Amino acid sequence: MIQELFRKDIKDFRPYDAKGEKYKIKLDANESFIGLSKEIKNKIIRSLIELEFNNYPDPDATKLKKAYGDYIGIDEKNIMVGNGSDELIQILTNAFLDKNEKIVTLNPDFSMYEVYTKVRGGKVSVFDLDEDFKLNVNKIIEYINEEKPKMFIFSNPNNPTGGVIPKYDIIKIIENVNCIVVVDEAYMEFYGDSILDYIKKYDNLIVLRTASKAIGSAALRLGFLITNDTLLREIKKVKPPFNVNSVSQVIGEIILKDKDFIRESIDKVLYERNYLLKELKKIDGLKVYETKSNFVLIYNENANEINESLIKIGIKVRSFTDENLKNFIRITVGSREQNIEVINCIKGDNYDYKEM
C-alpha cells in the first residue's frame, strides 16, 4: 500500500552512489589531499566562538559572496551561493523545467544533471562524446537545435574524463543555440581557461563553481552560481531562503580570503598530477588520458581486477558500472605517498595486461 504512494516515475530510479565506507586511502571523490593551514584553523576557531548559533544564517550569504567575488574577480551581485553545486543544479532544473521539458547533456559527464532533471519530471537527451572523449562542436550545435531543450549543461573540465572544451568552442555553442548554456567549472582552477568573463555578454550563459575541489572545502558544501543580472533575478525566486548554514559561510569566507593558501594548494595538486600521469604512462597496457583536472582516467580490459586489488590494500578509487565506462578507473590525485601506493599496486605482477 505504502509503495503505491511513491511517484511511478522514480520506481526504477537509480540514486547517486555515495557510499561512506572507510578506506586507508580515499581517491574516489576528487577531494583535495591538502588540509587547512594552522593559521586558517585558528581563525576559524575564533570566528566560531563568536558565531550566534541561535539565529538563522544570512539568506544571501553576503560576506561569503563578497569573498568569492574577490577570489574570482567577478562582481558579487552576479553570484548566488548554494549548498554545494548539487543544490544549484537542482535549483536550475526548478527554475527552467516544466514537467516533460528537456535538457541536453553529454556522455560521459556528471550524473547529477540527469538525476535532478528526472526528479523534476523532465527529460534528458544525451549527446555522446567520441571514442577519445572529444566533442564535435558542429554536431552538438545541430543536436541541440534539433532537440530544442531548455538547457544544455556540461562540465568543463569534464568529469570523469578530465578533458576540456576550448573556450572558443563554448562561445560558438552559446551563440548558435536557443537555450540556456550551463558550464559547470567545478575543476576550473586546475585548467584556467574559464568562460566567466562572458557572463554579461551572453544572456543565456550560467557558470557553476564549487569550493569542494581546488579550495579543499568539500565538508562545507559550498557551490557558486554566476550569471547576468536578469537570469539571476529569476533563478533566485526558487532558491530556499536559508540554504547555506552560518558555519559554512563563516569558514568559507576565511578560506577564500587566504588566496596564497589556495594558490599553493593548487600548485601542489598540479605537481602531483604531473607525477601521477608520468608514472601511470610507464605501465604497459594502461591507456592514460590527459587531464586538466585533479584526477586521472585510465583504461584497461582488466580494470575490475585492478580495482579489486586496490580495495584489498585499502585504496578506494572510482570504478564505473556504465557500459561505456566499464573498463575505466578514475583516480583522484593524492599526496606523493598515496600516489606511490596506487602506482605500485597497479604495476604489480598481478595482472595479465592486454595491449590496446
Curated annotation (Swiss-Prot):
Obligatory cofactor(s): pyridoxal 5'-phosphate
Keyword field: Amino-acid biosynthesis, Aminotransferase, Histidine biosynthesis, Pyridoxal phosphate, Transferase
GO molecular-function term, one example from the UniProt record: pyridoxal phosphate binding
InterPro entries assigned to the protein according to its UniProt record, in alphabetical order: Aminotransferase_I/II_large (IPR004839), HisP_aminotrans (IPR005861), PyrdxlP-dep_Trfase (IPR015424), PyrdxlP-dep_Trfase_major (IPR015421), PyrdxlP-dep_Trfase_small (IPR015422)
Catalysed reactions, as listed in the record: L-histidinol phosphate + 2-oxoglutarate = 3-(imidazol-4-yl)-2-oxopropyl phosphate + L-glutamate
Cited SUPFAM superfamilies: PLP-dependent transferases
Enzyme Commission code: 2.6.1.9
Pathway participation: Amino-acid biosynthesis; L-histidine biosynthesis; L-histidine from 5-phospho-alpha-D-ribose 1-diphosphate: step 7/9
Gene3D superfamilies named among the record's database cross-references: Aspartate Aminotransferase, domain 1, Type I PLP-dependent aspartate aminotransferase-like (Major domain)
Top-level taxon in the UniProt lineage: Bacteria
Pfam families recorded: Aminotran_1_2 (PF00155)
Record GO biological process: L-histidine biosynthetic process
Modified residues (N6-(pyridoxal phosphate)lysine): K213
Disulphide linkage map: none
CDD domains assigned: AAT_like
Coiled coil: none
Self-association state and partner proteins as the record states: Homodimer.
Protein family per UniProt: Belongs to the class-II pyridoxal-phosphate-dependent aminotransferase family. Histidinol-phosphate aminotransferase subfamily.
Protein name: Histidinol-phosphate aminotransferase
